[in-house]
């Protein structure tokens, strides 16, 4: 309970930092925010390093490590996702909800609709009656819970030590993507725990007397990964192939099964999307090759606009790099000191040449190498993306060897359970917390990106202020969905996800940045607009205030050098005949280019949302309720309950949760492919029918559940719920003021200019 109090304090500190940043105290707010994250991590690690650690305390600390940082990161805006990638996936999610079907085109991230696992799971929760944002939030928290609990369980199973699982989660928390990337609404957030669960199930199957149940769970998880994230599915298949090569005996055949399933599911789903995957990966590989060959280098501790990180952040990043390198080196030395002779010794002393531990260590040793590769622009992205996967074996080795090194092994006679005095423990926790902060800062980007504040150019969340949101809201209500629009990089995602428009950057050899860069508008620009079939043009005069924070205003390669837009370039549209002003407030204008002879083309989903009749909803609910209720009432129930009980005994709660997430994802995708749309009415009818068919069993389950409730803990939790709810209420009120009330004031401002566009027929 004390740990939860500290976690609540950390969340309150983060919300306080958000409020400070909004009041132009960004420097102090950044320090306060980091202190909050340090408290969240250190308090959990303090519990994990207790001399006497119970499983309940370990589980509480592990859950806090997974949930609290994610909530703290999103506390900057609880009402909307402000990440660039998150808005891309929100477009895919809203297309599914609007069209009731899969695979509607995404204008910015074409591969997203082809891997709809995350969105399908969110849709299934939304169909129960949850609002869209609440359903998305539930998915994120479930994924975070599955990630840390599956990792903890896997390490405990491999090491046989309760503490090792918790230490492994703490070690994984220092990865750069743990706080930011793997807690956002993006497909890797779901795919990563599913992949880890599949690997863990296969690890258990190696020594199981009846591995079929575990194979089934691994198959469900691997298929869930295959339909959720292309990169994770490919990397999982590659890892399982390598694992098969280094395994021996009967275990090799069991791991081989997982490798075959991973390869088959990944390739089967990817073959359909091959052209999109080429478009996705091709530019990345070309960009990396040009940077490595052309000598491009990034300036350390600076963003693309030249803004430098504070000194204390630089010191934390340097400490992180040194600590990570030293820790990897220590792992290598310690590992080789324990089992190196079996690898390098005489043949009679090494029955197997390649050990799985050596494979894991080899993967871990890539971390310092890729960290050094951050000197090139794409090197940072490669390290950040790969760290989510490479830190998994890192955490396993740290959990295994930290327990052996720090705590005496129980096999040794007359040994105390704890080797070091409390001062050493405190110093170790401080050093680990500093490393956690270094990873958090490295993965979350520049200091300005971690907290809200005044508008900045091409700065992701800092480019989504009330002025921008008001323009997007007006466009959603007044512009035809699917219409083509040009906008800067960040706001293109908002127009796509929130307004249903179709942002476009280039088409048939022409691009939209050329319309902005240049002092005049001539025949060439008019021809470009016609070729692009560009109906609307979005302009924010603040783009001329500075260079883009993340390297480009619109897209990579928009100009030959770091050219800054000027105010004249962004105001020239007012004097061009044929360009009509539709919206203006403050620095933002939206123009209609139809007067230039642009033939309108609408893309993506822009139809009416299909209606599901009440009869259909009742029929689906009745069929589902009868199927489940009669099954539970029949002789099939014990036949199904026995395998389920055995599965739970074999897999445990963490892997059961991950497998359930994968199964729900696949179930939702199948329903969408069959054009079956569930509704809250269908769920309510089905649940009511199950209760009516099985009243006695329902009452028994309720009584059994009530007897298992620990009412003292419920009372204590209720007391803590009040301050937790208060902190979230403050954060939500702050977000509502920016996202709702200020937006409405802008839309109602009498000095704003609003005009209705001319409606014309459009082709698709």
What do the predicted segments below correspond to?
Residues 30-35, 181, 188, 234, ...:
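Hydrophobic/aromatic-rich transmembrane helices and adjacent perimembrane loops
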Residues 63-70, 118, 122, 140-244, ...:
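Membrane-embedded helix bundles of polyisoprenyl
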Residues 51, 208-212, 250-257, 329-365, ...:
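Membrane-interface helix-loop-helix junctions at transmembrane boundaries of multi-pass membrane enzymes
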Residues 85, 186-191, 213-216, 220-340, ...:
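Transmembrane catalytic cores of multi-pass membrane glycosyltransferases
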Residues 51, 56-61, 68-193, 389, ...:
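Active-site lumenal/periplasmic loops and adjacent helix-entry segments of GT-C-fold
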Residues 4-7, 188, 400, 404-623, ...:
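Extracytoplasmic
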Residues 59-67, 218, 239, 260-261, ...:
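Transmembrane alpha-helix segments characteristic
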Residues 1-56, 596-711, 717, 732-735:
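Membrane-embedded, hydrophobic transmembrane alpha-helices
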């Amino acid at each position: 309970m004390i740990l939860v109090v500290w976690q609540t304090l950390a969340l309150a500190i983060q919300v306080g930092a958000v409020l400070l940043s909004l009041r132009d105290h960004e420097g102090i707010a950044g320090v306060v925010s980091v202190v909050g994250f340090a408290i969240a991590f250190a308090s959990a690690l303090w519990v994990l390093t207790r001399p006497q650690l119970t499983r309940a305390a370990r589980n509480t600390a592990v859950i806090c490590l997974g949930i609290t940082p994610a909530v703290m990161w999103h506390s900057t805006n609880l009402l909307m996702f402000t990440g660039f990638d998150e808005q891309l996936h929100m477009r895919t999610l809203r297309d599914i909800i609007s069209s009731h079907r899969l695979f509607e085109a995404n204008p910015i991230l074409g591969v997203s609709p082809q891997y709809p696992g995350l969105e399908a799971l969110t849709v299934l929760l939304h169909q129960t009656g949850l609002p869209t944002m609440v359903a998305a939030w539930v998915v994120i928290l479930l994924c975070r819970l599955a990630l840390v609990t599956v990792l903890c369980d896997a390490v405990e199973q491999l090491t046989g030590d309760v503490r090792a699982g918790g230490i492994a989660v703490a070690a994984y928390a220092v990865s750069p993507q743990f706080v930011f990337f793997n807690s956002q609404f993006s497909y890797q957030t779901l795919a990563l725990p599913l992949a880890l669960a599949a690997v863990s199930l296969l690890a258990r199957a190696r020594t199981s007397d009846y591995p079929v149940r575990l194979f089934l769970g691994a198959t469900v998880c691997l298929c869930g990964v295959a339909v959720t994230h292309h990169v994770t599915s490919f990397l999982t298949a590659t890892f399982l192939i390598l694992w098969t090569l280094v395994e021996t005996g009967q275990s090799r055949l069991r791991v081989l099964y997982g490798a075959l399933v991973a390869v088959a599911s990944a390739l089967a789903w990817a073959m359909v999307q091959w052209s999109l995957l080429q478009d996705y990966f091709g530019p990345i590989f070309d960009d990396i090759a040009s940077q490595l060959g052309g000598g491009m280098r990034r300036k350390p501790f600076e963003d693309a606009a030249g803004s430098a990180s504070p000194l204390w952040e630089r010191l934390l990043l340097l400490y992180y790099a040194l600590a990570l390198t030293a820790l990897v080196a220590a792992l290598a030395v310690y590992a080789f000191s324990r089992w190196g002779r079996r690898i390098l010794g005489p043949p009679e002393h090494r029955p197997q040449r390649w050990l799985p531990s050596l494979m894991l260590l080899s993967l871990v040793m890539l971390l310092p190498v890729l960290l050094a590769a951050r000197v090139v622009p794409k090197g940072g992205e490669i390290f950040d993306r790969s760290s989510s996967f490479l830190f998994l074996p890192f955490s396993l080795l740290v959990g295994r060897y930290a327990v052996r090194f720090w705590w005496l092994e129980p096999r040794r006679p007359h040994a105390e359970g704890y080797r070091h005095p409390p001062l050493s423990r405190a110093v170790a926790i401080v050093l680990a917390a500093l490393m956690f902060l270094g990873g958090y800062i490295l993965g979350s980007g520049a200091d300005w990106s971690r907290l809200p504040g005044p508008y900045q150019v091409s700065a992701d969340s800092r480019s989504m202020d009330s002025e921008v949101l008001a323009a997007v809201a007006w466009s959603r209500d007044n512009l035809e969905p699917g219409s083509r629009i040009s906008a800067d990089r960040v706001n293109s995602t908002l127009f796509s996800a929130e307004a249903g428009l179709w942002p476009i950057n280039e088409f048939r050899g022409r691009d939209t940045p050329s319309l902005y860069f240049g002092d005049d508008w001539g025949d060439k620009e008019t021809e470009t607009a016609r070729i692009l079939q560009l109906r609307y043009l979005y302009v924010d005069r603040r783009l001329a205030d500075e260079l883009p924070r993340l390297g480009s205003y619109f897209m990579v390669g928009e100009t030959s050098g770091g050219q800054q837009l000027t105010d004249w370039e962004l105001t020239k549209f007012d004097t061009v005949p044929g360009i009509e002003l539709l919206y203006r407030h403050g620095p933002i204008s939206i123009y209609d280019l139809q007067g230039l002879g642009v033939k309108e083309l609408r893309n993506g989903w822009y139809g009416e949302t299909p209606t599901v009749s009440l009869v259909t909803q009742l029929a689906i609910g009745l069929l589902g309720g009868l199927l489940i209720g009669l099954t539970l009432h029949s002789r099939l129930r014990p036949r199904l309950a026995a395998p389920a009980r055995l599965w739970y005994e074999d897999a445990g709660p963490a892997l059961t949760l991950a497998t359930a997430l994968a199964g729900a994802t696949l179930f939702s995708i199948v329903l969408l492919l069959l054009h079956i749309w569930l509704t809250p009415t269908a769920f309510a009818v089905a649940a009511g029918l199950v209760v009516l068919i099985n009243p006695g069993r329902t009452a028994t389950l309720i009584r059994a559940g009530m007897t298992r409730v620990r009412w003292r803990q419920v009372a204590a939790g209720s007391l803590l719920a009040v301050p937790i709810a208060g902190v979230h209420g403050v954060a939500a009120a702050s977000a509502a003021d920016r996202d709702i009330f200020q937006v409405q004031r802008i839309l109602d401002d009498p000095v704003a200019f609003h005009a209705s566009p001319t409606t014309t027929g459009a082709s698709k």
